[in-house]
């Protein structure tokens, strides 16, 4: 069984909606999913390692959402060893209005997680809020990402 923890950074609730849709689509599968808002966690969420999905919007001029900021800052300042962490990444942003800082919050998380030894599985999904329904695009991306996770981690799907 694959245990997946989705960590959500959101300013207006869209990233949380995306995480909820992913959780709904995985309901009834052999994947155990637990979703947590970054507002309510600290770096100890990574204790013991595992598979994580970072799902975050970008706020303002490329900023991490307000509620996720303490969590992000703790990673920057305490620099825990995350070599036993595997993760995927979904970034949400507005390419039309903020092209220069499109999905910067997700890119910031990707950078710090990599620096701390975590290993990203697959390519990130960067969703432009002007082109697609983020929850539908994320759910579609998730199908391929789960296959890649299982392959890289040597976990077979149960019937």
Residue ranges and their predicted role:
Residues 2-5, 13-17, 25, 29, ...:
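FMN-binding flavodoxin-like domain, especially the glycine-rich phosphate-binding loop
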Residues 29-43:
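A short, well-structured beta->alpha microelement
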């Amino acid at each position: 069984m694959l245990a997946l923890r989705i960590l959500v950074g959101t300013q207006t609730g869209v990233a949380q909606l995306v995480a909820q849709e992913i959780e709904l689509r995985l309901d009834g599968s052999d994947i155990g999913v637990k979703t947590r808002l970054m507002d309510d966690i600290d770096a100890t969420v990574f204790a013991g390692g595992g598979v994580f999905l970072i799902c975050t919007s970008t706020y303002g001029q490329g900023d991490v959402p307000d509620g996720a900021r303490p969590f992000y800052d703790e990673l920057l300042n305490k620099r825990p060893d995350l070599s036993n962490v595997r993760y995927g990444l979904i970034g949400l942003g507005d390419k039309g209005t903020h092209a220069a800082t499109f999905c910067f919050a997700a890119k910031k998380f990707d950078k710090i997680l990599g620096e701390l030894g975590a290993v990203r599985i697959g390519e990130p999904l960067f969703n432009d809020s002007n082109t697609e329904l983020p929850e539908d695009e994320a759910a579609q991306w998730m199908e391929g990402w789960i296959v890649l996770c299982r392959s890289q981690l040597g976990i077979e799907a149960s019937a």
